UniProtKB/Swiss-Prot annotation:
Purpose of the protein: Component of the ubiquinol-cytochrome c reductase complex (complex III or cytochrome b-c1 complex) that is part of the mitochondrial respiratory chain. The b-c1 complex mediates electron transfer from ubiquinol to cytochrome c. Contributes to the generation of a proton gradient across the mitochondrial membrane that is then used for ATP synthesis.
GO biological process, one term: mitochondrial electron transport, ubiquinol to cytochrome c
The organism's taxonomic lineage, starting at the top: Eukaryota, Metazoa, Chordata, Craniata, Vertebrata
Cofactor(s) in the UniProt record: heme b
Bilayer topology term: Multi-pass membrane protein
Entry's Gene Ontology cellular component terms: mitochondrial inner membrane; respiratory chain complex III
Free-text comment on the cofactor: Binds 2 heme b groups non-covalently.
Sequence intervals crossing the membrane: 33-53, 77-98, 113-133, 178-198, 226-246, 288-308, 320-340, 347-367
Protein's UniProt name: Cytochrome b
Cysteines joined through disulfide linkages: none
UniProt record similarity statement: Belongs to the cytochrome b family.
Any GO MF annotation of the entry: metal ion binding
Record-listed heme b b562 binding positions: 83, 182
Subcellular location: Mitochondrion inner membrane
Length: 379
């Protein structure tokens, strides 16, 4: 009898992706974060679906509907906090996943890498529109400030902002369309994630040594399914600790106040996972320049395959670039910290230095260190 999973038209696809997939035998736990991102997406879609059953996207009732979910719906408080903190877990996994891709040179698989960048941008868009939905003070003013950035685009900026708002300010029309976007985007992310996997399985996965591993492959199941399961259990453990013991630790206190267009919060800031980009935006005094820097802070990831001139794959045997990489990570943490600080001395100066360092490392220092290491190999 033929094995069903190898011959059935649908099961065959699953088999080649998750069961009989030839996988390098030496991939470490840093490769777990792809499956963890998949798990985060499933959690977000499921919890979001149950929240959407009780949420109303109207400016007069949105805030009270969130309060109703937490107070009156069975385990509504848990679903809400799993969804809110699940977003933070999603971005933690996302940052580690991208960081691992940079460290181990996964950007040489350019199609997979570029779809990954699209996924990153789509996830950021989803998180942004989702943050507006509770209609608290920070939701409202965050939406106002960030959407207003589009007015920096020459000629069409103001029209574009009013088109997105659906009026002359952030109001009912904005909230309704943001809810619609927040509902549909995760499914688009899921579709892109499948394309991401498709391209990855065309070339095969990278491995920590950066060497060709064709001669040393093992089946994905049971070796990496069990390894992924361990990662998933650890992720769920951290998520449950966050949701049950520290549910509001990553939120903003201003969001416990209903949105009020007549009262501006002292410090408008986005969620913690956007702070690095927000710090870069604020570091440039010119509005259009700030918006361009903000967009480039993410799109510069697409430059990694173009700027790669190293003769070695990944940073495992490249000590000079390793040092620069860890300076880059430290710099990102500094930017995240600065993004949450008020716009005053010395924070503005530190932010400007960190922003310049961010782009300098990627555009200048990494290619220079690649050249140095290439010359060392020749010695």
């Amino acid at each position: 009898m033929k094995i069903l999973r190898k011959n059935h038209p649908l099961l065959k696809i699953i088999n080649h992706s998750f069961i009989d997939l030839p996988t390098p035998s030496n991939i470490s736990s840093w490769w777990n974060f792809g499956s963890l991102l998949g798990m985060c997406l499933v959690i977000q879609i499921l919890t979001g679906l149950f929240l959407a059953m009780h949420y109303t996207s109207d400016t007069t009732t949105a805030f009270s509907s969130v309060a109703h979910i937490c107070r009156d719906v069975n385990y509504g408080w848990l679903i809400r906090y799993l969804h809110a903190n699940g977003a933070s877990m999603f971005f933690i996994c996302l940052f580690i996943h991208v960081g691992r891709g940079i460290y181990y040179g996964s950007y040489v698989l350019s199609e997979t890498w570029n779809i990954g960048i699209i996924l990153f941008l789509t996830t950021m868009a989803t998180a942004f529109v989702g943050y507006v939905l509770p209609w608290g003070q920070m939701s409202f003013w965050g939406a106002t400030v960030i959407t207003n950035l589009l007015s920096a685009i020459p000629y069409i900026g103001s029209t574009l902002v009013e088109w997105i708002w659906g009026g002359f300010s952030v109001d009912k029309a904005t909230l309704t369309r943001f809810f619609a976007f927040h509902f549909i985007l995760p499914f688009i992310i899921a579709a892109f994630a499948l394309v991401h996997l498709l391209f990855l399985h065309e070339t095969g996965s990278n491995n920590p040594s950066g060497l060709n591993s064709d001669s040393d492959k093992i089946p994905f199941h049971p070796y990496y399914t069990t390894k992924d399961l361990l990662g998933i259990f650890l992720l769920l453990l951290v998520l449950m600790i966050l949701a049950l013991f520290f549910p509001d630790i990553l939120g903003d206190p201003d969001n416990f106040t209903p949105a009020n267009p007549l009262n501006t919060p002292a410090h408008i800031k986005p969620e913690w996972y956007f702070l690095f980009a927000y710090a870069i935006l604020r570091s440039i005094p010119n509005k259009l320049g700030g918006v361009l820097a903000l967009v480039l802070s993410i799109l510069i990831l697409a430059a990694f395959p173009l700027l790669n001139i190293s003769k070695q794959h990944g940073l495992i045997f490249r000590p000079v670039t390793q040092i620069i990489y860890w300076i880059f990570i430290a710099n990102l943490l500094v930017l995240t910290w600065i993004g949450g600080q008020p716009v005053e001395y010395p924070f503005t100066t530190i932010g400007q230095i960190a922003s310049i360092t961010y782009f300098t490392i990627i555009i200048i220092l990494i290619p220079v260190s690649n050249t140095i290491e290439n010359n060392i190999i020749k010695l």
